[in-house]
Amino acid sequence: MRETILGNNIRKVPSVAVGCMRLSEKSKNEMNHFIHAALEQGAYFFDHADIYGGGMSESVFGEAFADDPSLKREDIYLQSKCGIRQGFYDLSKEHILKSVDGILKRLHTDYLDLLLLHRPDALVEPEEVAAAFDVLFESGKVRHFGVSNHKPMQIELLQKYVRQPLVVNQVQFSIPVSNLVANGMEVNMETPGSIDHDGSLLDYCRLHSITLQAWSPFQMPAWKGCFLGSDEYPELNKKLHVIAEKYNVSDTTI
């Protein structure tokens, strides 16, 4: 598994994180097999969130991991997210601290390697986020922090108060959802792609050593499902298949 540098040379992590959103209905045995299969491929970076499966994805993962003595906490990198509540987003100090305690309990661990704020809270009080992060960092419950789905100025606002560097921004990115790159190629053009919806997010993150993570990298725009094999992208799928055959791997691998 290839590795990439996280943030400003914090450490190396696998280039592919194992998404755990749809694992809530797995049995303990199935989850154990899932974890071992990932580790055998060098994929030791697991991405969770407190809302995945209503918390069950973390619970099943944590139970399977804790019950297998061959699995060691120091051999994996655990990331989770908080801030989404029923009907609104909440980045208050109280909610962040309560959420992390729940995450740690469900995952059967005493620390997270990385905590992300899942969505921007339009009513956020950045001082509360800073206070929560200080408590989590100083107690050893969270080692590094980041965000998800945030624009540059939202990150700037948080970073004005938060002492710890925000090292990750997880956003939707895939071949069909490639506006982060396309915007930069259509500057000063009268085309739909020239409209910058994200505030030069790609350039901002590169300038500030913030690692961009892609969520749902196989997904089409507007939550239409996977683009692999879709009739909406015949030329793309044909090209992917040609490349996959060349290297004797699956289209998904490419």
Residue ranges of each PLM-predicted region?
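N-terminal binding-site loop/beta-alpha segment at the start of enzyme catalytic domains
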Residues: 1-76, 138, 220-221
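Active-site mouth loops of central-metabolism enzymes
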Residues: 19-29, 82-94, 123
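Generic structural signal for well-ordered alpha-helices
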Residues: 3, 35, 58, 62-65, ...
